[in-house]
């Protein structure tokens, strides 16, 4: 999957670890949405 920035990673992409994975159809079982606002397409999820 494509890495994405969780809320817990920091305010922006630069210099932060992207600990989430972008899912287009929602988070799979056992994962949770880790970003409160956005991304515009899909969900940023982590285990």
From Swiss-Prot:
InterPro entries per the UniProt record, alphabetical: Anenome_toxin, Myo_ane_neurotoxin_sf
UniProt-listed GO biological process terms: regulation of signal transduction
Main location: secreted
Disulfide bonds: 4-44, 6-34, 27-45
Domain of life of the source: Eukaryota
Tissue: Expressed in ectodermal glands. Not expressed in nematocytes.
Compartments where located: Secreted
Keyword annotations of the record: Cardiotoxin, Disulfide bond, Ion channel impairing toxin, Neurotoxin, Secreted, Toxin, Voltage-gated sodium channel impairing toxin
UniProt keyword Secreted present: yes
A cellular component term, taken from the record's GO annotations: extracellular region
GO molecular function, one term: sodium channel regulator activity
Alphabetized Gene3D superfamilies for the sequence: Anthopleurin-A
Pfam hit, one: Toxin_4
Tagged with keyword DNA repair: no
Function: Modifies current passing through the fast sodium channel (Nav) in neuroblastoma cells, leading to delayed and incomplete inactivation. Produces a positive inotropic effect in mammalian heart muscle. Paralyzes the shore crab (C.maenas) by tetanic contractions after intramuscular injection.
Similarity comment: family membership: Belongs to the sea anemone sodium channel inhibitory toxin family. Type I subfamily.
Protein name (database record): Delta-actitoxin-Ael1d
Natural source organism: Anthopleura elegantissima (Green aggregating anemone)
